[in-house]
A protein has these predicted regions:
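Alpha-helical structural signal in soluble globular domains
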Residues: 25-29, 76-80, 103-104, 124, ...
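Glycine-rich beta-alpha loop elements in corrinoid/cobalamin-binding modules
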Residues: 2, 18, 25-26, 33-149
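A structural micro-motif
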Residues: 1, 30, 84-85, 250-251, ...
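Residue-level recognition of beta-strand->loop/alpha-helix junctions
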Residues: 7, 34-38, 61, 195, ...
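Radical SAM [4Fe-4S] cluster-binding motif and immediate context
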Residues: 159-302
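Mobile, glycine- and charge-enriched loop segments
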Residues: 15-36, 75, 170-176, 181, ...
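A short, flexible N-terminal coil/short beta segment enriched in small residues
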Residues: 1-17
């Protein structure tokens, strides 16, 4: 079955890691391709392009910035081809299965991480088998469980999603999103990340290999997707040390960190060894009003 994995990014410079992960996890087993659009593009144009590809399956990665547009897009696609199978996945759909199945013109929702279950779903569709997969729901068969967390060593065994040949030509024009861990140690009630339990880390050997290979491209900005890069001090220090020793002139790394739990060892290491203009940090405050922080379980020490 010809399958397209796609999404609407907020800007052209943003590059969807999720599409590339699903692609490398399925391309050796199914006729799968991916493409990206932006929220600024005309939906009729996108519809016509997707229909012209003659896909049998279209899978969307859904986020807060594109969910309403994807709702419209799904209706347009189904109007053009009622037989088209539409799958939604991503953080925005994972916790409201009923809402999306009841209000969107779609066929399936994947809840949770998709690298394993997306392939399993395509297997079933290809072979016309009954679908009984944890984390996969249809209008008639709803599974409110999340898919099982993916063993990160499995992802490490796949072709690198960061270094696909098709991406090499415009590496300098787009932000490269990179993950060294999954999960979040915090419980902030306003954030979907708080629903994931525990932290999992990619192996240092894998991360070092990816960073080393990326330094041989002309990428300019590498933004880490880790929810709190400094959640585990030893891990953060190991990554920083490798970056400092192997970086290329003209590249910048951007991190999201929690300032109130920033270990002094990290501060000292950056002050002593960080090359100029190599690092950028996002430090979330959210609120300085303590009663609000307590209600939403955003614990921070000012």
């Amino acid at each position: 079955m010809k399958t397209l994995i796609t999404t609407l990014n907020s800007k052209f410079i943003h590059k969807s890691l999720s599409l590339r992960l699903l692609y490398v996890a399925t391309k050796n087993y199914h006729n799968v391709d991916f493409c990206e659009y932006t929220i600024k593009e005309d939906l009729d144009k996108i519809t016509n392009e997707i229909i012209a590809m003659n896909n049998q399956v279209v899978a969307f990665s859904v986020y807060i910035w594109n969910v309403e547009l994807i709702k419209i897009l799904c209706s347009k696609l189904k109007k053009e081809n009622k037989e088209l199978i539409i799958i939604l996945g991503g953080p925005e759909v994972s916790y409201e299965i009923d809402y999306f199945l009841d209000n969107f013109d779609i066929d399936y929702v994947i809840s949770g991480e998709g690298e394993i279950v997306f392939k399993q779903l395509l297997d079933c569709l290809e072979n016309k088998q009954p679908i009984d997969i944890q984390g996969v729901s249809s209008k008639d068969n709803r599974d409110y469980r999340q898919s099982k967390p993916v063993d990160l060593s499995y992802i490490e065994s796949l072709e690198s999603p960061y270094l696909l040949k098709r991406d090499l030509a415009d590496m300098s024009k787009r932000v490269l999103y990179f993950e060294t861990s999954r999960g979040c140690p915090y419980q902030c009630q306003y954030c979907l990340s708080s629903l994931e339990k525990g932290l999992r880390f990619f192996s240092l050997d894998y991360l070092k290999k990816q960073i080393n290979l990326l330094m041989k491209t002309d990428v300019k900005i590498i933004k880490l997707l880790d929810r709190s890069f400094n959640a585990k001090t030893e891990h953060a220090l190991a990554i920083l040390k490798y970056i400092f020793e192997n970086y290329r002139e003209g590249v910048q790394f951007q991190f999201e960190i929690n300032g109130d739990v920033l270990d002094q060892r990290i501060i000292d290491y950056i002050n002593d060894y960080a090359p100029e203009s190599l690092l950028r940090f996002e430090i979330g405050i959210q609120s300085t009003y303590e009663p609000t922080n307590e209600i939403v379980k955003r614990y921070q020490d000012f």
